[in-house]
């Protein structure tokens, strides 16, 4: 009488418990393929969520129209900055931290906290202060990806702007201290520090 073969699950378990060279090789290859696919998918997701179109999908009624009338969108040279240029850091660690915070913001939109212009405006100061604090903490790094105070020609600026830019280094100020509202409508600024005090 012939021996009965163990069922397929039992055979797989035995194969898995006593891995041969082929089994180990298969596991390594499948793990490598899985890792590559995960990395590609992860980067694809990062790129898709780093576009102006993605940002506008939630901000079509509030922040996006304001941006379209800003100096960062309409420029005499045609060189502009899109949403991720200002709101998403370039460095990987800082970018991941910002993406986690952005996920909370997307959640707030879809759960109805800021899904209308009225609700958005009610939370505008809170959201703006969070963004200003982030920019202050990183010395307005996203601004400095394009703007370099050391390369500014102060003679071509209005006198007050030239004075302020020259004082930045000595007073420990950064771009966002004076340039709040550069791309979006300002909230009610009662009690909010506006930036440099110009002393002539």
Swiss-Prot record:
Q: Where does heme 2 bind?
A: 83, 86-87, 184
Q: Name one GO molecular function term.
A: electron transfer activity
- Hey, which stretches end up on the Cytoplasmic side? 1-21
**UniProt superkingdom:** Bacteria
Q: Which UniProt keywords apply?
A: Cell inner membrane, Cell membrane, Electron transport, Heme, Iron, Membrane, Metal-binding, Transmembrane, Transmembrane helix, Transport
Q: How does it sit in the membrane?
A: Single-pass membrane protein
Provide a GO biological process annotation: anaerobic respiration
**Primary location:** membrane
Give the binding site residues for substrate: 99
The UniProt entry's GO CC annotations, sorted and at most eight, read: plasma membrane
- Would you tell me the protein name for this molecule? Cytochrome c-type protein NapC
Residues reported in the UniProt entry to bind heme 4: 175, 178-179
Binding positions (heme 1):
55, 58, 60, 105
Q: Where in the cell is it found?
A: Cell inner membrane
Q: Which family does it belong to?
A: Belongs to the NapC/NirT/NrfH family.
Residue positions annotated to bind heme 3 are: 143, 146-147
Q: Which residues lie on this side of the membrane: Periplasmic?
A: 43-200
What's this chain's function?
Answer: Mediates electron flow from quinones to the NapAB complex.
Posttranslational modification, per the record? Binds 4 heme groups per subunit.
Checking InterPro entries in the record gives: Cytochrome_c-type_ET, Multihaem_cyt_sf, NapC/NirT/NrfH, NapC/NirT_cyt_c_N, NapC/NirT_cytc_sf, NO3Rdtase_cyt_c_NapC/NirT
Tell me where the transmembrane regions lie. 22-42
